């Protein structure tokens, strides 16, 4: 009972047309054989043509699949000689890493700082860092910096420049997908630089407008440097406003008692420089040939922190004339009148020479005038070459020779 006879078939008791599906729409071409009978199966069997299997292959029929290499994106965004140069750089770098011994001392980046950067990650903060990890991180950072610099240098070379600029780095970042994480940083820096440059330009225009209203011209700056907005006067205007010039501004000379106001000084002593921020300099004409101008009072520029000190402690021991600037040793007899030169034999050796800065005239009167040659080189007095006979014939010498020294023992003799 469990056996099934061989004569049993699924077609037994079923009509002949069971395997045919007729479309209810009446289209005779839409009949499909489902394949219950032998006739339906034989209809779908078609003869296989005789084709060489080596000529037709399913790999050749489909498009070739390119296997991506880890170095395919090295030359991304570059063509021609630039791509070839970058490919050669990477090949040389790989050969160096594979064959040369990598020493820790040859690294250009500090390992301690790299460890701190690695510790900022939340996954590594509470874990130990191996000794090789900072080394590999530093080596990869060096290669990354070198490649980015090389791409920026190729862009600067096209523009015939020898220095890298911010635009070169931005161009190198925009050409490769590997540097997408730097786009936000570069764009932020560019926005900050543009804002600062526009603000400096606005301040310069405002200062120029204010200077035009006040009759002042802005100080010219060098190319590439922002104008700080300090207007400088022209050569025909005073460096201070009228309100400041009305105040008593003192000008110290060699002695603080000889103070002069700023209005008394000639305006030609100030000059405006074309380039550079220099202080107004004092134009002192060299009139060394004119003897009358040697001992005239010249204003001396004193530093602000020394003005109060000089006012409280005046240097009264210095001579206010031209000899205050010339410290040379000369005989005192050269600065004396002619009749005092005859007393040179009675003077001691320590009193013969005295610095001219401290050598004041013993008798009131104007100091002796010197010509240009005598100011530079001390000239001997002609009185030194007079003979004793000539001195005896001098009436001045006879006048002093008859006088006795009050401290001498012979001065107490009765007349």
Swiss-Prot record:
Biological process per Gene Ontology, one example term: regulation of transcription by RNA polymerase II
Gene3D superfamilies: Histone, subunit A
Stretch list, region Disordered: 354-415
Alphabetized CDD domains for the sequence: HFD_NFYC-like
A cellular-component GO term for this protein: chromatin
Pfam families associated with the record: Histone
Stretches with biased composition (Polar residues): 369-415
InterPro entries referenced in this protein's UniProt entry, alphabetically: Histone-fold, Histone_H2A/H2B/H3, Transcr_DNA_Rep_Reg
Keyword rRNA processing: no
Keywords: Activator, DNA-binding, Nucleus, Transcription, Transcription regulation
Molecular function GO terms recorded: DNA binding; DNA-binding transcription factor activity, RNA polymerase II-specific; protein heterodimerization activity
Main location (coarse class): nucleus
Location of the protein in the cell: Nucleus
Family: Belongs to the NFYC/HAP5 subunit family.
Subunit note: Two complexes bind CCAAT; complex I, that consists of php2/3/5 and complex II, that consists of php2/3/5/4.
Protein name per the record: Transcriptional activator hap5
Gene for this chain: hap5
């Amino acid at each position: 009972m469990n056996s099934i006879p061989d004569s049993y078939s699924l077609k037994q008791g079923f009509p002949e047309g069971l395997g045919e599906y007729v479309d209810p729409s009446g289209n005779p071409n839409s009949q499909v054989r489902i394949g219950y009978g032998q006739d339906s199966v034989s209809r779908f069997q078609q003869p296989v043509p005789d084709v060489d299997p080596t000529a037709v292959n399913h790999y050749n029929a489909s498009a070739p699949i390119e296997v991506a290499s880890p170095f395919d994106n090295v030359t991304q965004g570059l063509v021609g000689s630039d791509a070839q140069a970058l490919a050669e750089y990477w090949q040389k770098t790989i050969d160096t890493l594979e064959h040369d011994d990598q020493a820790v001392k040859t690294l250009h980046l500090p390992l301690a700082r790299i460890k701190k950067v690695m510790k900022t990650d939340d996954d590594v903060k509470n874990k130990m860092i191996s000794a090789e990890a900072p080394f590999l991180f530093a080596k990869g950072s060096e290669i990354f910096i070198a490649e980015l610099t090389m791409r920026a240098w190729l862009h600067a070379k096209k523009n015939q420049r020898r220095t890298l600029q911010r635009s070169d780095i931005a161009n190198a970042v925009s050409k490769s997908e590997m540097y997408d994480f730097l786009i936000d940083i570069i764009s932020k820096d560019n926005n900050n630089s543009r804002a600062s440059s526009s603000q400096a330009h606005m301040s310069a225009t405002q200062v120029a407008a204010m200077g035009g209203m006040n009759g002042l011209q802005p100080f010219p700056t060098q190319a590439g440097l922002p104008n700080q907005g300090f207007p400088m006067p022209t050569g025909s205007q005073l460096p201070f406003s009228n309100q400041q010039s009305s105040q008593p501004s003192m000008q110290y000379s060699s002695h603080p008692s000889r103070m002069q106001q700023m209005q008394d000084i000639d305006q030609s002593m100030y000059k405006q420089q074309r380039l550079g921020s220099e202080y107004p300099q004092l134009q002192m004409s060299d009139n060394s040939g004119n003897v009358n101008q040697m001992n005239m009072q010249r204003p001396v520029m004193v530093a602000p922190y020394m003005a109060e000190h000089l006012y409280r402690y005046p240097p009264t021991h210095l001579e206010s004339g031209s000899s205050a600037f010339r410290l040379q040793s000369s005989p005192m007899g050269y600065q004396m009148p002619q009749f005092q030169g005859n007393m040179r034999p009675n003077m001691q050796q320590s009193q013969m020479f005295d610095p001219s800065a401290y050598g004041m005239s013993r008798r009131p009167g104007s100091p002796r005038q010197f010509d240009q040659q005598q100011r530079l080189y001390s000239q001997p007095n002609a009185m030194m070459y007079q003979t004793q006979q000539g001195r005896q014939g001098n009436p001045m010498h006879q006048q002093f020779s008859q006088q006795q020294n009050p401290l001498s023992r012979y001065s107490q003799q009765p007349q």
